[in-house]
């Protein structure tokens, strides 16, 4: 194999972050931290503009959703899927904004 380790292809149909956000949404957690729109309830204009599906999963990082600074679960899975898709050794997710 020309000195290359055999790679196992990952299931590229997976979307670990989206799956975790949907599971979290179904838990009906009431947030007491940021963002201030409180899953759309605190800002009807924003909800009308972006849609309930968007603001319903716009949440701060918490344990079930992993942490971008030190990913250990769903973000790490997503990074591994990205690396596999690109044929890279590693991939790192970044966000814009605050």
Regions found by a protein language model. Give the residues of each.
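N-terminal glycine-rich, Lys/His-bearing helix-loop that initiates the first secondary-structure elements
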Residues: 1-57
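Conserved N-terminal alpha-helix of the aminotransferase class I/II PLP-enzyme fold
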Residues: 55-98
